[in-house]
């Protein structure tokens, strides 16, 4: 650090005057680049000034005039709660009277006067003057305050400060302009400045105003020793302190995470988290996730959000990044922190947990993996009969299940039934009442008769006298099963006979059904006698319809729908399991279009919701299944559900856009969906979501086919154009602008901090403009498009070229550029991370041993059959735009032919927005920047365009009026042209 800025070390330089004198010979106007703080150190022999206590860099607030003086002066770097200290300097190698002045200077590479003022004891006109000596040559500054000048008064204040410095000889050659280094030192009285000197000062003030950072200052100490006449004209070399940051400035305050609503997320990322923090600068902040492994490797990812997702500089809504390995089997602990882009300063990291992906959220796979029933478990005899027979007891004995003494079906007397717990009846949650059983039996008999008549099957009855008992011992066992009353006392009559009669009736029905099935081969014969059991649910709440759909038995579902009892038909077909899923929900989830159609014909209710508030329309939209969605939309009751929001506040159109399904979106639009419906969390429309995902086809479909409101706003007044401009989406900005989006719409986010920029400005009191898309433009290309400049499409690269080897079409110079870019020490953009993204991370140790790891990596990738498309996708995940540009430029140049069409909007002269405006008004709408650098101020985002040339223009823009008069047909034609170019 000493080699970079010796002033910070507090040691002066005797060569300064010589350098000032040399640079004073320059006649170049406004060239302040000659004066830098990078001067060599020296060993002082004569008097010199030294800082012995630096000021505290952070935690001190700059105050405005209306706020009054600060509570306590600027503390020293070593100041503590019970031991205060303040900035101090010492004049070394000298004893006697002296005068020390303190001026505020900038923190950049070049030292200039700062517009802020020092206030407090011994301070006048922004400069502090203190007498030192004659014995104690240590000077302390215990009451220094810093007065913050408003941005609108920077030029005026700075010019006055420069004139004063030149008149009094306070380092004018260093702080103002090298041509003014000849002006006398303090003590010779003020002198009048010439017109040329004033012009130099004015030009210097104009230039330095553009570059000044109002959130940070430094102290410059200059000592003057008396001459032979007693005047303080002998100036010692000045020394400059460490930087002092305004505690209220978002780009200077300490970063701190205050609260997060979630501390864990899925490895696939994309989950929304609300984060509260201390004041941040919305275009200069990142949310960094990182993990360090045992071998010193580093993984990092960044939360996804735009400037519109930062609320009042204190809250950020972002989506988590994907973890480096989405196939983990146990949770992975990482850290999350805030990081400032400009200086890479970070907050204290907080723990975050990535858990494995839950691929079976609807528990379909889990239920499919349950042990399938074995045929031997249901067959009589042995442990199998007892363990899994339909009426088997728990003992597992040979006689505990059904007993078949012979294959003659007349021996029904040999059957006996033992009530016991089995797999079949353990999970029955809904027991049928006696009345229900009786009705079902009657219905069953009628249904059996129907099937008998239909298939012309003769059913012979079995006479009671053909039944015979199986023995005296079994009769004793049956007798032991007599029912007991509440007092556990045996009733007078045993119900063995009644139980046996019921069992015989059941056996007859099943026997007849088995005969019918044997004759017809129609499984419905077997299902018909058990249809009253379709209401029974297992441990998961699933009935037979649920399970048939889960296991993909489409024919069985169809058969069950045909034989189910009429009385409970609707209740059974719309029955919900423990996850509140109906059979129709499961059919949509498992993507069985035929089953969905069968259920709808059978009368399934499309209005029922699952545990998350999702209707079947939501589920089909989320899956992006246009075939199933088409079937559902044809249902007569679907229209009432098409705009319904689920538990997350999303309607079907929002989920379709999130799923990136253009075909489903067209179906919803044709069905009359409200394309301007707002999701209930933040008020985003489908167009907002399409822009967030940078999906041009979806946005175009919404605008052209859905007539979406291009200037629809969220709860905070943000339009889709705000999002496109803030994220730097050039294509979408062009599409929205062509569709008539207004770049001057203000959202509710103030362009500047009311408490800071409006102070001492009565004229603007109460008028705080919001932020427009022009203010949020992330790059100059987007800004020019918003101002009406035609969109110029990049040279297209054919799919054939993308499918070739990654380096085949790159020339040698492009390869070298790519190698160099991948050799960067930045772990997020070097060859090692790229290898991980390309699936070659296992070879990193081998690559590291080669002379050029990046070259070796890409050579291996080429040999393995990798494509340019995959390479660009990996680089996109790394956010390595420079490498992507090198590849695309090389591929485009190799493909360029002489007959290549000029892909610009000029190819559509009748559709050009500028030509249209010119025809109507005779003028072109085109802003020109007068200030290429944005002004940094406390509480103001540096990338936001200045109010002077955006907000004021929006009030007087003729072209904005012209655009508002464009017909819908013209806008659609213009939008189509731009969408065509963005392909």
From Swiss-Prot:
What cellular-component terms does GO give this entry? cytoplasm; NF-kappaB p50/p65 complex
Report what the Swiss-Prot or TrEMBL entry states about this protein's PTMs. Answer: Generation of the NF-kappa-B p50 (Nuclear factor NF-kappa-B p50 subunit) transcription factor takes place both cotranslationally and post-translationally via non-mutually exclusive mechanisms. A cotranslational processing allows the production of both p50 and p105 (Nuclear factor NF-kappa-B p105 subunit) from a single NFKB1 mRNA. While translation occurs, the particular unfolded structure after the GRR repeat region acts as a substrate for the proteasome, promoting degradation of the C-terminus.
Comp. bias regions, Basic and acidic residues: 428-454
Domain RHD residue range list: 47-372
Q: Name one GO biological process term.
A: signal transduction
Domain of life where this protein originates = Eukaryota
Q: Where is this region: Disordered?
A: 423-454
CDD domains cross-referenced by the UniProt entry? Death_NFkB1_p105, IPT_NFkappaB, RHD-n_NFkB1
Region called GRR, residue ranges: 377-397
At what positions is S-nitrosocysteine found? 66
Question: Which keywords describe this protein according to UniProt?
Answer: Activator, ANK repeat, Cytoplasm, DNA-binding, Nucleus, Phosphoprotein, Repeat, S-nitrosylation, Transcription, Transcription regulation, Ubl conjugation
Record carries keyword Repressor: no
Q: List the disulfide bonds.
A: none
The ANK repeat boundaries are 540-569, 579-608, 612-641, 648-677, 682-712, 716-745, 769-799
Q: Does the keyword Ubl conjugation apply?
A: yes
According to the UniProt record, list the residues that bear Phosphoserine. 342, 938
Motif range for Nuclear localization signal?
365-370
Q: Locate the Death domain: which residues?
A: 804-891
Which Gene Ontology molecular-function terms are recorded?
A: DNA-binding transcription factor activity, RNA polymerase II-specific; NF-kappaB binding; RNA polymerase II cis-regulatory region sequence-specific DNA binding
What Gene3D superfamilies does the database record attribute to this sequence? Ankyrin repeat-containing domain, Death Domain, Fas, Immunoglobulins, Rel homology domain (RHD), DNA-binding domain
Record text on subunit structure and interactions:
Active NF-kappa-B is a heterodimer of an about 50 kDa DNA-binding subunit and the weak DNA-binding subunit p65. Two heterodimers might form a labile tetramer.
Record remark: domains: The C-terminus of p105 might be involved in cytoplasmic retention, inhibition of DNA-binding, and transcription activation. Glycine-rich region (GRR) is a critical element in the generation of p50 (Nuclear factor NF-kappa-B p50 subunit) by acting as a proteasomal 'stop signal', which leads to limited proteasomal degradation of the C-terminus, while generating p50.
What is the name attached to this protein's record?
Answer: Nuclear factor NF-kappa-B p105 subunit
Gene name for this UniProt entry: NFKB1
């Amino acid at each position: 650090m000493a080699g970079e800025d010796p002033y910070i070390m507090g040691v002066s330089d005797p060569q300064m005057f010589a350098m000032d004198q040399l640079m004073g010979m320059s006649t170049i106007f406004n060239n302040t680049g000659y004066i830098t703080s990078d001067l060599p150190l020296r060993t002082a022999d004569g008097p010199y000034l030294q800082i012995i206590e630096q000021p505290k860099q952070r935690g001190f607030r700059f105050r405005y005039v209306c706020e009054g003086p600060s509570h306590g002066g600027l503390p020293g770097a070593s100041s503590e709660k019970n031991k205060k200290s303040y900035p101090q300097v010492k004049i070394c190698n000298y004893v006697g009277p002296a005068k020390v002045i303190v001026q505020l200077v900038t923190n950049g590479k070049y030292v200039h006067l700062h517009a802020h003022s020092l206030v407090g004891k011994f301070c006048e006109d922004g400069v502090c003057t203190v007498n030192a000596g004659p014995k104690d040559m240590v000077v302390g500054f215990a009451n220094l305050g810093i007065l913050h000048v408003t941005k609108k008064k920077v030029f005026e204040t700075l010019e006055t400060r420069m004139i004063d410095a030149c008149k009094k000889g306070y380092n004018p050659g260093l702080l103002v302009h090298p041509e003014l280094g000849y002006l006398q030192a303090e003590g010779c009285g003020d002198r009048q400045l010439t017109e040329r000197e004033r012009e130099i000062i004015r030009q210097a003030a104009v230039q330095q105003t553009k570059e000044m950072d109002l959130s940070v200052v430094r102290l410059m100490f200059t000592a003057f020793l008396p001459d032979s006449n007693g005047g303080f004209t002998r100036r010692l070399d000045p020394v400059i302190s460490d930087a002092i940051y305004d505690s209220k400035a978002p780009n200077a305050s300490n970063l701190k995470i205050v609260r997060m609503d979630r501390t864990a997320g899925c490895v696939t990322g994309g989950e929304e988290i609300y984060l509260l923090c201390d004041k941040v600068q919305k275009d200069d902040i990142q949310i960094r996730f990182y993990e360090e492994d045992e071998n010193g490797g580093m993984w990092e990812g960044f939360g996804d959000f735009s400037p519109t997702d930062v609320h009042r500089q204190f809250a950020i809504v972002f989506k988590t990044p994907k973890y480096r390995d989405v196939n983990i089997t146990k949770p992975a602990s990482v850290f999350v922190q805030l990081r400032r882009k400009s200086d890479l300063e970070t907050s204290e990291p907080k723990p975050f947990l990535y858990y494995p992906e839950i691929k079976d959220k609807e528990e379909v796979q889990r239920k499919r993996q349950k042990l399938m029933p074995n045929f031997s478990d249901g067959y009589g005899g042995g442990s199998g009969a007892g363990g899994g027979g339909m009426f088997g007891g728990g003992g597992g004995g040979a006689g505990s299940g059904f007993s078949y003494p012979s294959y003659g079906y007349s021996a029904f007397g040999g059957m006996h039934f033992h009530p016991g717990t089995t797999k079949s009846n353990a999970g029955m949650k809904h027991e049928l009442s006696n009345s229900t059983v009786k009705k079902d039996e009657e219905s069953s008999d009628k249904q059996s008769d129907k099937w008998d008549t239909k298939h012309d099957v003769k059913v012979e009855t079995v006479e009671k006298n053909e039944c015979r008992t199986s023995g005296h011992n079994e009769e004793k066992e049956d007798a032991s099963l007599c029912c007991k009353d509440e007092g556990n006392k045996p009733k007078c009559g045993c119900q063995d006979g009644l139980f046996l009669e019921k069992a015989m009736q059941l056996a007859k029905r099943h026997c007849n059904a088995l005969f019918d099935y044997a004759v017809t081969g129609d499984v419905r014969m077997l299902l018909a006698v058990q249809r009253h059991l379709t209401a029974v649910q297992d441990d998961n709440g699933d009935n037979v319809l649920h399970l048939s759909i889960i296991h993909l038995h489409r024919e069985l579902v169809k058969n069950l729908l045909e034989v189910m009892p009429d009385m409970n038909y609707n209740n059974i077909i719309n029955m919900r399991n423990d996850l509140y899923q109906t059979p129709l929900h499961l059919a949509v989830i498992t993507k069985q279009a035929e089953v969905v159609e069968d259920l709808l014909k059978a009368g399934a209710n499309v209005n029922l919701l699952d545990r998350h508030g999702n209707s079947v329309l939501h589920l089909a939209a989320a899956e992006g299944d246009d075939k199933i969605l088409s079937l559902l939309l044809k249902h007569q009751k679907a229209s009432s559900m098409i705009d319904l929001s689920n538990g997350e506040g999303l309607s079907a159109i929002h989920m379709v856009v999130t799923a990136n399904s253009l075909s489903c979106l067209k179906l919803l639009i044709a069905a009359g969906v409200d394309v301007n419906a707002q999701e209930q969390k933040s008020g985003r429309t489908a167009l907002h979501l399409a822009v967030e995902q940078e999906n041009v086809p979806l946005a175009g479909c919404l605008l052209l086919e859905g007539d979406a409101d291009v200037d629809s706003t969220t709860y905070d007044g943000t339009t889709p154009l705000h999002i496109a401009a803030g994220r730097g989406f050039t294509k979408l900005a062009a599409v929205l602008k062509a569709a008539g989006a207004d770049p001057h719409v203000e959202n509710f986010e103030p362009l500047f901090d009311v408490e800071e920029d409006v102070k001492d400005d009565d004229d603007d009191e109460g008028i705080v403009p919001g932020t427009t898309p022009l203010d949020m433009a992330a790059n100059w290309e987007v800004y020019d498009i918003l101002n009406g400049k035609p969109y110029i499409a990049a040279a297209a690269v054919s799919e054939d070229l993308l499918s070739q080897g990654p380096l085949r079409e790159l020339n040698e110079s492009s390869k070298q550029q790519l190698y160099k870019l991948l050799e960067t020490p930045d772990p997020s953009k070097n060859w090692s991370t790229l290898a991980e993204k390309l699936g070659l991370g296992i070879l990193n140790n081998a690559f590291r041993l080669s002379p050029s790891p990046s070259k070796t990596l890409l050579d291996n990738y080429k040999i393995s059959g990798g494509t340019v498309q995959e390479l660009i996708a990996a680089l996109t995940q790394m956010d390595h735009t420079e490498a992507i540009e090198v590849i695309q430029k090389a591929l485009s140049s190799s493909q360029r032919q002489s007959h290549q069409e000029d892909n610009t909007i000029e190819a559509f002269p009748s559709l050009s927005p500028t030509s249209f405006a010119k025809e109507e008004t005779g003028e072109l709408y085109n802003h020109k920047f007068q200030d290429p650098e944005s002004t940094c101020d406390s509480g103001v985002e540096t990338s936001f365009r200045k109010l002077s040339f955006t907000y004021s223009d929006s009030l007087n823009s003729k072209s904005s009026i012209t655009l508002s008069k464009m017909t819908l047909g013209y806008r659609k034609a213009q939008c189509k042209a731009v969408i065509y170019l963005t392909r």
